[in-house]
Regions:
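Histidine- and/or cysteine-centered catalytic micro-motif in compact active-site loops
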Residues: 250, 299, 310
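Assembly/interface hotspot detector across virion components, adhesins/toxins, and nucleic-acid enzymes
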Residues: 3-9, 55-57, 307
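Extended amphipathic alpha-helical segments with heptad-repeat/coiled-coil character used for oligomerization
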Residues: 307-323
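Internal mixed beta-strand/loop scaffold within catalytic domains of large alpha/beta enzymes
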Residues: 155-265, 402, 406, 414-416
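C-terminus-biased signal that marks the final domain/tail of proteins
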Residues: 21-168, 270-293, 299-304, 326-554
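Bacterial Sec-dependent N-terminal signal peptides
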Residues: 1-28
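Short, surface-exposed beta-strand-loop junctions and turns on beta-sheet-rich folds
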Residues: 200-202, 252-253, 312-314, 420-424
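Short beta-strand-to-turn element immediately C-terminal to the catalytic PLP-Schiff-base lysine
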Residues: 182-183, 297, 307
Length: 554
């Protein structure tokens, strides 16, 4: 992590010396002359219901926001911004406060701002004008509070590369997702079904205002996607033709400039493709700046594929002799079979483990339906059902997902998880009904009779303890950083809240190591090593500490 931060700040310093390369991008704005730029009038019906003509924004009883917008790119952008106004400003505050927490130094923040301006200098050249225009429309409703980072439009454009930049800074753990698809003999009725967890984690507050967005553009197909205020890119979505997209990060090198953000590429596929071949053709047109697996499902083809993209090459991973497809955070196609970074990802990360766990759970279920798919997404155990501890990234359900989502493309049905994570009720939407002509009532679009109940885990003592653990885990991090005294009672309580998670013993071991209580450190490091440790580097780190401790005890 440290080396990547130093690398980025070195680039930031370099960018001060060559800032002339950023002047065009700093002042660039999309061409909106062909559009009507009149700002929409919004009527506030209640504190959680807003309308503007045919467009609406409301919060349903499960806590999900539902957005319906139609029009040309500028109309969609302006109306989205106007309807989501207060949430949009709150979301940017949450995101940028996280950056401040991560980089408290004012000098380093300044360097990061310089880096972002330099790094994103070519971003606008790689985003189609229709999406630049939409982003411009939304940006008119953002706060001026963060103009020191960049002006409204440029800042909003930068945020669409947040997934990609978080991915490049992999150690930030912003990204790590699991997805699967089943069809023919593997699904009920033989029709395609897909499901995924989107583990893009900033903090709990960031995921509070999930939006199920339903967009009817003048050009392209109507579609839905799960998003957050200010985000027009697609991370999970399905269009009216029954084509779905979801994205999973893979191992990537740090490129020297931004290209097309993955979420913009997938938005283009979602809006303009109805078959797998059309999705592939769109992907071939764009240059990306990180490595990503795009799972594309198609009702017309009744199957799913992976479009694997990187800054240098692209591959299509098909499974011609199978009726299921699994994806975590590594590439599977021939083009990347000998790729050094991909092989390292498989060997050292938790990606392969989650892949095998999905294989295991799918093999236990002869035919997948939405309820079974939700159970797989919510699964917290490891291979052969071993306890991993709650929050372990080896689990499919890491208890940090922004959302879980399930698609049945032929039926045009989609299920979106309400908070928290993927544990809340999976709310069902029927795109036939949403985009139908009879939209006279201002009410939730959900098909209530098809909803999937919330996870019973929410009512358990274990879940309540996990919530307490998150608080105590943050506390122990602060105490360790400040090298303050931690009471035996605190450590005992901390470990009891999540006893199967290796982290609670590792951090206790670190404390005792700091205090030169080497026997206690040894016992805790040894206990951690008996549990399922998330990654190979994590395990090696503990083993290194244990060697040091044993030498101290000799």
């Amino acid at each position: 992590m440290k080396s990547r931060i130093i690398y980025f700040f070195s680039l930031g310093f370099l960018s001060l010396l060559i800032s002339c390369g950023t002047s065009k991008s700093k002042h660039h704005k999309p061409d909106i002359t062909a559009y009507n730029s009149t700002k929409p009038v919004v009527e506030k019906v209640t504190d959680s219901t807003f309308i503007s003509g045919k467009n609406s924004f409301l919060k349903n009883k499960q806590g999900l926001w539902e957005l319906y917008v139609e029009g040309d790119p500028l109309e969609i952008g302006l109306t989205t911004g106007a309807l989501t106004d207060s949430l949009l400003q709150k979301q940017q505050r949450i995101f940028f406060s996280k950056i401040t927490d991560f980089i408290p130094s004012k000098f380093q923040q300044k360097m990061l701002r310089q880096f972002l301006k330099w790094y994103n200098r070519k971003l606008y050249l790689n985003v189609p004008n229709e999406y630049q225009t939409e982003i411009y429309g939304v940006s008119q409703y953002t706060s001026n509070e963060f103009d020191n980072i960049a002006p409204q439009y440029q800042r909003s454009l930068y945020l669409h590369a947040a997934h990609d930049i978080g991915h490049a800074l992999q150690d930030l753990a912003l990204v790590g997702c699991s997805s699967f698809a089943a069809w023919n003999e593997k699904s009920e009725e033989g029709n395609l079904i897909l499901a995924r967890n989107f583990d893009f984690y900033v903090n709990d507050a960031f995921a509070e205002n999930k939006i199920a967005a339903f967009i009817k553009p003048k050009e392209g197909f109507p579609f839905m996607m799960v998003t957050w205020p200010g985000m027009i890119g697609a991370v999970s979505g399905m269009n009216y033709e029954g084509l779905t997209v979801t994205i999973n990060a893979s191992k990537s090198k740090i490129p020297l400039s931004a290209k097309t953000p993955i979420s913009i590429l997938t938005r283009e596929i979602l809006q303009h493709a109805k078959t797998l071949d059309e999705a592939i053709a769109i992907a071939k047109k764009r240059k990306v700046f990180v490595s990503e697996s795009i799972m594309v499902g198609s009702a017309n083809d009744n199957k799913a594929i992976l479009i694997e993209v990187s800054p240098n090459k692209m591959d299509v991973y098909d499974v011609p002799n199978s009726d299921q497809l699994i994806c975590s955070n590594h590439f599977q196609g021939d083009a990347f079979a000998a790729d050094k970074r991909n092989l390292e990802q498989i060997a050292n990360s938790h990606s392969e483990y989650r892949y095998e766990r999905m294989q295991e759970l799918l093999s236990e279920n002869l035919k997948v339906n939405p309820e079974i798919a939700s159970e797989i997404l919510r699964n917290k155990e490891g291979l052969q059902n071993i306890a991993l501890g709650y929050g372990n990234e080896k689990a499919l359900n890491q208890l940090l997902a922004h959302h879980g989502i399930i698609f049945k493309p032929k039926e045009k049905l989609v299920w979106v998880s309400a908070n928290p994570y993927q544990l809340g009720e999976f709310v069902c939407y029927d795109l036939n009904a949403v985009f139908g002509e009879n939209r006279n009532k201002i009410e939730s679009f959900q098909s209530k009779n098809l909803n999937i109940a919330k996870d019973p885990f929410l009512e358990t003592t274990a879940y309540q303890n996990f919530k307490k653990f998150k608080v105590e885990d943050h506390k122990i991090d602060v105490l360790l950083e400040k090298k303050e005294v931690i009471s035996p009672e605190f450590i005992q309580n901390y470990q009891s809240l999540n006893p199967d998670y290796w982290v609670v013993y590792y951090k206790a071991g670190l404390y005792f190591y700091q205090k030169k209580e080497y026997l206690q450190a040894k016992l805790n490091f040894e206990k951690a090593l008996t549990l399922e440790i998330t990654t190979v580097p994590d395990k090696e780190k503990i083993e290194k500490y244990l060697k040091k401790v044993k030498r101290k005890l000799q």
